Amino acid sequence: LDYKNWAVAGSVLSEDKYAYKIFNRLKEKGYNVVGIKPGVEEKDVFNNIRDIPYNIEVLDLCINPIKGLDIVKEASKLGINKILIQPGAESNEIINFCRENNINAIEGCALVELSKLV
C-alpha cells in the first residue's frame, strides 16, 4: 500500500462486487485509482489496461483468472511489476507467469490491508 497509482481489474461498477468496494476504498484513502473492466469505457474505468493515460504502479486483480491472465500479460508489457491477487482471482497460470516475468505478485485482500490504515 506504499504505492499511490493503482488499477483495479474487475466489476468496479457493481456495488455488490469486491472490485467495486476495493476501487472505492482506495479512492477514499487518497489513492489514484482507475478501474479495468473489459467491455466498459467511462470515467475512471477503462476497457483495457493499455488505455490508462498514466503509469500504474500496482494492479489489483479482482476478476476471473482466465481474463486476469490476459490483463497480467498486458500489464507486464507496460512494465507493471506489482500485482495484488485477490482471493478467487488466483490461478497457477497467473502465478507462474508472474514468476517467469519477474513480477512481484502477492495473494491477499486489499480491503483487509486498507482497514489497517488510520
Regions found by a protein language model. Give the residues of each.
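NAD(P)-binding Rossmann-fold cofactor-contacting core
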Residues: 14-16, 20-43
